Swiss-Prot record:
Pfam families: Proton_antipo_M
Protein name, entry field: NADH-quinone oxidoreductase subunit N
Chemical reaction(s) catalysed: a quinone + NADH + 5 H(+)(in) = a quinol + NAD(+) + 4 H(+)(out)
Parts of the chain that traverse the membrane: 28-48, 57-77, 94-114, 147-167, 170-190, 206-226, 249-269, 288-308, 315-335, 343-363, 380-400, 424-444, 458-478, 503-523
Keywords carried by this UniProt record: Cell membrane, Membrane, NAD, Quinone, Translocase, Transmembrane, Transmembrane helix, Transport
Gene: nuoN
GO molecular function: NADH dehydrogenase (ubiquinone) activity; NADH:ubiquinone reductase (non-electrogenic) activity; quinone binding
Organism field: Cutibacterium acnes (strain DSM 16379 / KPA171202)
Its EC number(s): 7.1.1.-
Localization (cell): Cell membrane
Source organism superkingdom: Bacteria
Its biological purpose: NDH-1 shuttles electrons from NADH, via FMN and iron-sulfur (Fe-S) centers, to quinones in the respiratory chain. The immediate electron acceptor for the enzyme in this species is believed to be a menaquinone. Couples the redox reaction to proton translocation (for every two electrons transferred, four hydrogen ions are translocated across the cytoplasmic membrane), and thus conserves the redox energy in a proton gradient.
Keyword Translocase found: yes
This protein's GO CC annotations: plasma membrane
């Protein structure tokens, strides 16, 4: 008898009797909340009149992020950690911690998106599809149009980032990568200021991002050819049995790492970072500096620790070289920058190198697998929390310092604003000292824990190089303080104005500044929390 004609108890032919997919709604609730909120935001664009669209989008976005944070905290409180979504998603400790950081950063980013300073307009162009300088663009400006689509794009990007951080399957990781990359490509080209530069940034990011995605996918194919599965656990089993003999795993590992290091912004895959950060709208640059780097780091650690742990002798030294190159390029080239956004781009490259020191120290014979891995994961989460606080706050300050044409990002134009506006001077000092890793700030705590992870992992030489380049990078951070307090504006230059933040802007700045200091003065509670959430499910 033809086996296709066999009838099962369900009434279906045997070959068609496929088990229905099962989703664990509880652990994945934050993902579903964000997905629902993003879909509602799309409907708002379609059905809400233009006059009420902006306020409605802000309410929907903030409410969605708050509910998603509450849902994540509820999942953490329950304490159950399972592999969900047919084995494709792992809402484990690192994932849940990443979700909290990501969603909290998203709330700060909404403030940047919505901030109106100097004029009635935001940082986003009135008509993205019009030719820069055309009558159509001028008409859109006169009518005070806004692209409120940026809010659903933000939520879809956050949705992809959440899935990426939780991905326990290489295909899910690739799909999530594309989900959060595509909205970012669009957002990068929507700057109101320097339209042509913004469009150039979006095109560069898209082309190089497409190349990195292709390499990432090719690496997945090679790993699948070796393991016969896309799941990281199966890949780990294949690596154990074939270690030292399979060139296929090594080639696939390199290509996957290239795709992830591109998103982290590590040398030599960081050529896009200065141009994109400079040309993109300031709120988008701030969001990318924190969120993209955070989820890419967590994804990299999950692939290396869970799937490719047996190949640690191959990837450790490569990552160490990448870390040194990133620290060196970011710190040295940053010294020559005269534009604030471009300086922060090279700062982000240097920070990518610093945080990779902790990633490299995960696997050694001295610490053992479990202890070394746990210390590295928690150190990366602490570092990115500290970096996120300073970044969101400082990028918001960039929105405040303005000239007639928009934001004033030349470092020299900030001369003396610390004396004329003491509040912005104090905030600049707090955030810049945190970037530099000065004691009693969150940045010092972050660097301390990642350097300790590298040291305990047997990479003392890498830590010493990191300390050296930290001193180099401190020079251009301190230069900002010198300009803000001890320099005067040149005669004949256009005057610079410092806009007053909105109430939400003030709250964001105060929260970022306070937690930056608290993490520097009393870091142990946050370190303990991340230590408890630092083990990947396998």
């Amino acid at each position: 008898m033809n086996p296709a004609l066999l009838i099962t108890a369900s009434g279906l032919p045997a070959l068609l009797d496929v088990a229905a997919p099962h989703l664990e709604w509880g652990p994945l609730a934050p993902v579903f909340v964000l997905m629902a909120g993003a879909c509602v935001a799309v409907l708002v664009e379609a059905f809400v009149p233009r006059s009420g669209r902006r306020s409605t989008q802000i309410i929907v976005t903030v409410a969605t992020l708050v509910v998603a944070i509450a849902s994540t905290l509820t999942t953490i409180a329950r304490g159950t950690r399972i592999v969900a979504g047919q084995g494709t998603l792992a809402p484990d400790g690192p994932t849940l911690a990443t979700w909290v950081i990501l969603l909290a950063t998203g709330l700060g980013t909404v403030v940047l998106f919505a901030e109106r300073v100097g004029t009635t307009q935001t940082a986003f162009v009135a008509s993205a599809s019009s030719v820069p300088g055309s009558p159509l663009e001028a008409k859109a400006e006169q009518e005070h149009r806004e692209h409120t689509e940026v809010y659903p794009l933000l939520m879809f990007a956050a949705l992809g980032m959440m899935c990426f951080a939780a991905a326990n399957d290489l295909i899910m990781m690739f799909v999530a990568l594309e989900i959060f990359s595509l909205p970012l490509y669009l957002l990068c080209g929507m700057s109101r200021r320097r339209r042509l530069l913004s469009q150039e940034a979006a095109l560069k990011y898209f082309l190089l991002g497409a190349l990195s995605s292709a390499l990432f996918l090719y690496g997945i194919v090679l790993l699948y050819g070796c393991a016969g599965s896309f799941k990281l656990g199966d890949l780990a089993a294949a690596g154990v049995t074939q270690v030292g003999s399979s060139k296929l795993i090594v080639a696939g590992m390199i290509l996957v790492a290239v795709g992830l290091l591109f998103k982290i912004g590590a040398v030599p895959f960081a050529s896009w970072t200065p141009d994109v950060y400079t040309g993109a709208p300031t709120p988008v640059s701030g969001w990318m500096a924190v969120a993209t780097k955070l989820v890419a780091l967590v994804g990299l650690m999950r692939v290396l620790y869970v799937g490719l742990g047996a190949m640690r002798w191959d990837w450790q030294i490569v990552l160490a070289v990448v870390a040194v190159a990133s620290m060196g390029v970011g710190a040295i080239v940053g010294l020559a920058q005269t534009d604030m956004k471009r300086l922060l781009a090279y700062s982000a490259i240097a920070h990518a190198g610093f945080v990779l020191v902790g990633v490299v120290g995960a696997w050694t014979t001295q610490t053992g697998m479990a202890e070394g891995q746990t210390g590295s994961v928690s150190s990366v989460l602490v570092y990115m929390t500290a970096y996120g606080l300073a970044s969101i706050g400082f990028w918001l300050l960039i929105l405040m310092v303005r000239r007639a044409g928009g934001e004033s990002t030349e470092i020299a134009s900030w001369a003396g604003i610390g004396r004329s506006h003491p509040w912005i001077g104090v905030l600049v000092v707090i955030f810049v000292l945190s970037f530099a890793g000065i004691p009693l700030t969150a940045g010092f705590t972050g660097k301390l824990v990642v350097f300790l992870a590298g040291w305990r992992g047997g990479y003392a030489w890498l830590v010493l190089i990191g300390v050296l380049f930290s001193l180099v990078a401190a020079a251009f951070y301190l230069r900002i303080i010198v300009v803000v307090f001890f320099r005067s504006a040149k005669e004949g230059d256009d005057p610079v104005e410092v806009a007053e933040p909105s109430i939400a802007g003030w709250i964001t700045l105060i929260v970022c500044a306070v937690f930056t200091i608290v993490m520097g003065v009393a870091p142990q509670p946050i370190i303990d929390l991340f230590n408890q959430a630092s083990t990947f499910l396998r």
